[in-house]
Curated annotation (Swiss-Prot):
<feature type="domain" description="Lon N-terminal">
    <location>
        <begin position="25"/>
        <end position="219"/>
    </location>
</feature>
<dbReference type="GO" id="GO:0006515">
    <property type="term" value="P:protein quality control for misfolded or incompletely synthesized proteins"/>
</dbReference>
<dbReference type="InterPro" id="IPR004815">
    <property type="entry name" value="Lon_bac/euk-typ"/>
</dbReference>
<dbReference type="Pfam" id="PF05362">
    <property type="entry name" value="Lon_C"/>
</dbReference>
<dbReference type="GO" id="GO:0005737">
    <property type="term" value="C:cytoplasm"/>
</dbReference>
<dbReference type="GO" id="GO:0004252">
    <property type="term" value="F:serine-type endopeptidase activity"/>
</dbReference>
<keyword id="KW-0645">Protease</keyword>
<dbReference type="GO" id="GO:0004176">
    <property type="term" value="F:ATP-dependent peptidase activity"/>
</dbReference>
<dbReference type="InterPro" id="IPR027417">
    <property type="entry name" value="P-loop_NTPase"/>
</dbReference>
<dbReference type="Pfam" id="PF22667">
    <property type="entry name" value="Lon_lid"/>
</dbReference>
<dbReference type="InterPro" id="IPR008269">
    <property type="entry name" value="Lon_proteolytic"/>
</dbReference>
<keyword id="KW-0547">Nucleotide-binding</keyword>
<feature type="binding site">
    <location>
        <begin position="372"/>
        <end position="379"/>
    </location>
    <ligand>
        <name>ATP</name>
    </ligand>
</feature>
<keyword id="KW-0378">Hydrolase</keyword>
<dbReference type="InterPro" id="IPR054594">
    <property type="entry name" value="Lon_lid"/>
</dbReference>
<dbReference type="InterPro" id="IPR003111">
    <property type="entry name" value="Lon_prtase_N"/>
</dbReference>
<dbReference type="InterPro" id="IPR015947">
    <property type="entry name" value="PUA-like_sf"/>
</dbReference>
């Protein structure tokens, strides 16, 4: 519910609208206590809404304090509160280390809540004063008042906890109604219900009669306590004083036939513990803590800590599984195919796991790690696996987590301690075998608070996680039935011991054809539904989708593609809302109108920049997928200097030195004057200077750039290359072949030069459809690279000029 007014009225039988001094004030719900007029009450304010209420008070510190009907309700609604409370003024606010507040509030007068005008972020209500019925002075009133004083003095005198000053204060109060309020607020044994009943009693004579009854009962309890004390004193040692006092309280309650809230809490928790199906050692620990709770006062500092701990133990799914039954492999395959296009290797590995799981249900599950660029479906694949298995899906993001306690929890000695994210996820799942996704595991940080990745070692080790021990719970929990799935954009930041525990499954980028299929099968229907558009209102042509892919996105995944499709759908929704159209056929021209000018230059960028000799296109791998990389070389008069710029790493700088050495040693064969290097300086630059770059795979690109510059031969149009070189001129294999190839295709490259040893990777990772329109050359030496990348005669140079002009639309095709 937002900050909207709610006309919520109490239907209390004693409600009377007989006051005209209505006020609208902040309302503070309290539990296990009642604030009386003229009494000062210390309150611990911990709920977020209550903290916001106190912090919002300005110069006017007046609030309304109302007791809850049930103390266990954490987020009370108007129906959970009594109708009568106290108008109060806040005198002092102390901030506690655990972000809660310690507030001193003084009651002013009784008020009745007539209407709640606000529920969030905190309650505000209209209240009116409850007038007190003052009977005329009479002998009966005088007798009741004196009896109250007498009984109260006897109780204070016989109580080891009540101060004698209370009797003195009570004797100095002449007004009978105020005396009753003082006595009621001073008796710790009076229940919240009884205190509220006295607060709601406007007639002073009736109020005197009620407090007399409670005092007589309390005095009887006190006398009985003294009797019990004499019976048990010989059996209790001085070192067991706290236990002895709890026994007294239990014996008193037994004699009176009463049971307080704490006893009821203990009984309810005991039932939950018995029904939770805990292992014997865990149940023993829970019952031990229950015994402590039963002997503890609800006002004790450790009461809520112990209660929360037992509740956590009781609600965890110790024996509760998903009950999905036997795994249906054909159905699982259909679900994976329905949710994701292609990804055949990934699906095969998942189906292999499910098949083994069907044959051996108690097998230790592998830890799968989906590695790949953003937007390729890593997280959604985890959801599909959960659906195929018929299990709950839980996801937590580890990006930016620096504290080890986020994984394993805080110890109970800390204020506000809670279990870690893993056990909280298990509780949310309500089963002990969910599919548990740890997202962005490569972005876990570390600092002085610990290393979260080290805390994951136990949880992600199938040999150890059958007894995972959270710091807060401090009892073993079996995680062996959980199917853990992690995701990462790159594997290098993941510590080696953690990476060793996971089975890496690469999810590589999509080709244009795959993106088209994904757009029509998943993205367009989803965006139509999200934007309230039916299939009859919009029709995307394949050419329009391809235009978005080529000229408005350059990515390995499909997030920006979906974002642009969503933009088109929203603009159509606006046209329909304005009555301008009822149906739209989306064509390439429509895309330009709705999305503006082209954001990505395909073909033309490469053709334009490689017109000059010395500029060559390389291929690079990035965590977001592959990309093209321009390498530029230039020369000037000098003394043989060699400059390298572009935020280059050490490995890349060494590749440049090797490239220059090879060119110098083969200058004669290449037709380059050997004295040229002594009289000129050479500068190699890799643009996008703000982006760090490293790796050996640009070696062939640098050699080609130098030879192109020194022989004045521009790179052949729409050609790109990758490969590591040696000083002897051999071309060595590189990694990330699929990502680099798909990046080249996205950029409009038509010819790719690759090391011959990478042919096997191309055959395994790429389909003929993905390679359609691309000519791939596999080379073993740098001589083969130069033969393909640079024109060898005037005829080829003229042909290259015509091809480049066609791409740039500079001259008609010849």
């Amino acid at each position: 519910m937002a900050n909207e007014a709610h006309n919520i009225e109490h239907t209390d039988p004693e409600f009377r609208d007989d006051s005209a001094d209505a006020r609208t004030l902040p309302l503070l719900p309290v539990r296990d206590t009642v604030l009386f007029p003229h009494a000062v009450l210390p309150l611990t304010v911990g709920r977020e809404s209550s903290v916001q209420l106190i912090n919002s008070l300005g110069e006017d510190k007046t609030i309304v304090v109302v007791a809850q009907r049930e103390a266990r309700v954490d987020s009370p609604q108007p129906s959970d509160l009594f109708a009568i409370g106290s108008l109060a003024v806040v005198h002092k606010v102390v901030k506690m280390p655990n972000q809660s507040l310690f507030v001193f509030a003084e009651g002013l007068e009784r008020v009745r809540v007539t209407e709640y005008v606000q529920l969030n972020p905190y309650m505000r209500a209209t209240v009116e004063t409850v007038p007190e019925a003052f009977p005329p002075k009479s002998a009966e009133i005088e007798a009741l008042q004196r009896n109250v004083l007498t009984l109260f003095q006897q109780i204070v005198t016989g109580s080891p906890t009540l101060s004698d000053e209370l009797s003195t204060v009570a004797m100095n109060i002449e007004e009978p109604g105020r005396l009753v309020d003082f006595v009621a607020s001073s008796l710790p044994s009076l229940s919240t219900k009884d205190k509220q009943e006295i607060l709601e009693t406007a007639d002073v004579q009736i109020r005197l009669d009620k407090i007399n009854q409670h005092l007589a009962k309390e005095l009887e309890v006190q006398q009985l306590r003294n009797k019990i004390q004499s019976e048990v004193q010989d059996r209790v040692q001085q070192t067991q004083r706290e236990y002895y006092l709890r026994e007294q309280l239990k014996a008193i309650q037994k004699e009176l036939g009463e049971q307080d809230d704490s006893t009821r809490d203990a009984d309810e928790l005991r039932e939950k513990v018995e029904a939770a199906g805990m292992p014997d050692d865990v149940k023993k620990e829970a019952l031990k803590e229950l015994g402590r709770l039963a002997r503890m006062s609800p006002m004790a500092a450790d009461y809520s800590v112990t209660r929360n701990y037992i509740e956590w133990l009781a609600v965890l799914p110790w024996q509760k599984s998903s009950g999905a039954g036997e795994i249906d492999i054909p159905k699982a395959k259909d679900i994976l195919d329905e949710d994701h296009y292609d990804l055949q290797k990934v699906k095969d590995r998942i189906l292999d796991y499910l098949s083994v799981r069907r044959l051996k249900p108690n097998m230790k599950g592998p830890i799968l790690c989906f590695s790949g660029p953003p937007g390729v479906g890593k997280t959604s694949l985890g959801k599909s696996i959960a659906r195929a298995l018929g299990r709950k899906f839980v996801r937590i993001s580890l990006g930016g987590v620096h504290d080890e306690a986020e994984i394993r929890g805080h110890r109970r000695t800390y204020i506000g301690a809670l279990p870690g994210q893993i056990m909280q996820g298990i509780r949310r799942a309500e089963t002990n075998d969910p599919v548990f996704m740890l997202d962005e595991i490569d972005k876990v940080g570390r600092d002085f608070r610990g290393d979260p990745s080290a805390a994951l070692l136990e949880a992600l080790d199938p040999e150890q996680n059958n007894s995972f021990r959270d710091n807060y719970l401090d009892v073993p929990f079996d995680l062996s039935k959980v199917l853990f799935i992690t995701t990462a954009n790159q594997l290098d930041p993941i510590p080696e011991p953690l990476r060793d525990r996971m089975e890496i499954i690469d999810l590589q980028g999509y080709s244009e054809e795959e993106k088209v299929h994904i757009a029509f099968r998943y993205l367009i229907p989803r965006q139509e539904e999200e934007n309230g558009i039916t299939k009859d209102m919009i029709e995307f042509s394949e050419e329009a989708v391809r235009r978005i892919i080529r000229h408005y996105t350059r990515e390995a995944g499909v997030r920006n593609l979906e974002r642009n499709i969503g933009t088109v759908c929203r603009k159509l929704a606006r046209r329909i809302a304005e009555g301008k159209t009822e149906k739209l056929a989306v064509t390439p021209q429509t895309i330009t109108e709705m999305l503006g000018g082209e954001k990505v230059r395909v073909d033309t960028e490469i053709a334009e920049r490689t017109k000059r000799a010395g500029v060559v296109v390389g291929l690079a791998w990035t965590p977001a997928g592959g990309d093209i990389l321009f390498v530029e070389a230039t020369t000037m008069k000098g003394k043989g200097g060699f400059t390298m710029t572009g935020q280059l790493g050490d490995v890349m700088r060494e590749s440049m030195q090797a490239a220059l050495s090879w060119v110098k040693s083969n200058a004669g064969k290449l037709g380059i004057d050997e004295e040229f290097f002594e009289k000129h300086d050479i500068h190699i630059h890799v643009p996008a200077g703000a982006i760090p770059k490293d790796g050996p795979s640009a070696g062939v690109t640098m050699v080609t750039a130098l030879v192109s510059l020194l022989t004045d031969k521009p790179l052949r149009p729409l050609t790109a290359m990758t490969g590591e070189i040696t000083l002897s001129g051999n071309v060595l294999p590189i990694g990330g072949v699929k990502e680099k190839t798909l990046a080249a295709k996205r950029a409009g490259v038509k010819t790719i030069i690759l090391p011959s040893e990478n042919k096997m990777n191309m055959d395994e990772d790429l389909t003929p459809e993905q390679l359609q329109g691309i000519e791939v050359h596999y080379v073993k030496t740098i001589d083969e690279v130069l033969e393909i990348a640079l024109p060898s005669n005037k005829a080829e140079e003229k042909q290259d000029a015509r091809t480049r002009a066609e791409v740039l639309n500079e001259v008609p095709a010849v």
